[in-house]
Amino acid sequence: EVARAQHEGLNVFAETCPQYLYLTLEEHLSQPDFEGAKFVCSPPIRSRHDHHHHQSDLWKGLRMNELAVVSTDHCPFCFKDQKTLGRNDFSKIPNGLPGVEHRMELIYQGVVLGELSLERWVETCCTTPARMFGMYPKKGIIAPGADADIVVWDPHQKTTIGINGKHHMNTD
């Protein structure tokens, strides 16, 4: 629908988040002892049985600029004090996942896997968001006159995502 609207010249855009590119219903939401509540978000994480098609469509959308940006919908909650509020009533589980801290490296993994070009990685995570929020060309580009917001990226750095070493204190 987004591609059709864009083709018709409508000023529309769409986004995705890292969790929809990598997580699956069976591996995350179906964990025992209510652990799956950690992964409740909207829209919901999809089943492994349709995830290949679903996730490959999302990667294709990023490559084809049908999905303009990768955001996070960053909305972290602690499991013990917040997510467990829904133990007896699913509707009381706070809805959301963290994502700001690891967004860049998760989407860079798409570059490593051949899902996205290096240039498109920069566009979806930096340049396009700067344009959308009216900050371009001060932000989102390395050029004379632009702010010198530069990240030195080590493509060989290994990261383990988990509760230890997180910089955001409201998530586990």
Identify what each model region corresponds to:
Residues K38-S42, E66-S71, L116-E119, N164-D172:
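Short secondary-structure transition/capping segments
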Residues V69, P76-P155:
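His/Asp/Glu-enriched, well-ordered alpha-helical/loop segment
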Residues E1-V70, C75, G86:
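Histidine/acidic residue-rich metal-binding segments in metalloenzymes
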Residues A3-R4, Q82-T84, N164-G165:
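Short amphipathic alpha-helical segments
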Residues P32, G86-F90, T160-D172:
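Short, surface-exposed loop/helix-turn segments at secondary-structure junctions
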Residues P18, D154-Q157:
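Non-catalytic surface loops within mature trypsin-like serine protease
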Residues L62-M64, I142-A146, H167-M169:
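A structural signal for short secondary-structure junctions
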Residues Y22, C78-K80, T160-I161:
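Glycine/Thr-rich phosphate-binding loops of Rossmann-like dinucleotide-binding domains
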